């Protein structure tokens, strides 16, 4: 999916919501535990309930890998289900990969060839040769970690050099030598607030994947005020605030209502550019 197609979906649905599929076997409704594949059963119900209101899904690989082979099977089934039934949805493998070149090449093959996923999150710490293998796939996206929403982001990402330049700013500037805004996005946490203003000075046209609204306390209004550009430029993720709002047999309907509420807020924000 290219940048223009992504923007067209945003305009059509009046939404830039990404639903995070951080599916924890210990948190799904009890009645699903009797299913042969409870993780997939939960994901399928969530996807069917929320697809009208979002433009992307983001399975977090850690939740699937923690279950071994069964978890990976559930992940693959989830990806295939979304592609077959909701082909307009942008799929993000939240894997945070990044290693020496030949290892990154294998990661890229996994997500882009074997699974045919639209995008993957990548850690930039090891530099250009750890990222470029992911960029060799036409039509696929790298979503590079820039400024995350966790407390530990202060340990490295916000440290300054002698000239006052912060590490995340170096990442943004250097990585633009590797790919343009048709192939690279950046992760910027919703809790970073005014930092979006600084980020847009460096990458005015790139899409930003923004986790951290909902359960993590980020403000959608603030993200849009400082981060939205003329083509929206935002994919805002909510995981727990949608998929875990209810643990009864009505969980899917509750997730749909939660997604609809966020979409309605996003529709208001989009009036500024549409």
UniProtKB/Swiss-Prot annotation:
Designated name of the protein? Orotidine 5'-phosphate decarboxylase
Its gene name is pyrF
**GO molecular function terms attached to this record:** orotidine-5'-phosphate decarboxylase activity
Keywords attached to this Swiss-Prot or TrEMBL record, sorted alphabetically, are:
Decarboxylase, Lyase, Pyrimidine biosynthesis
Q: In which pathway does it act?
A: Pyrimidine metabolism; UMP biosynthesis via de novo pathway; UMP from orotate: step 2/2
Organism whose genome encodes this protein: Bacteroides fragilis (strain ATCC 25285 / DSM 2151 / CCUG 4856 / JCM 11019 / LMG 10263 / NCTC 9343 / Onslow / VPI 2553 / EN-2)
Keyword Mitochondrion present in the record's keywords: the answer is: no
Any Pfam family from its record, for instance, is OMPdecase
> What is one process in the GO biological process aspect for this record?
'de novo' UMP biosynthetic process
Q: Which InterPro entries match?
A: Aldolase_TIM (IPR013785), OMPdecase_type-2 (IPR011995), OMPdeCOase_dom (IPR001754), RibuloseP-bd_barrel (IPR011060)
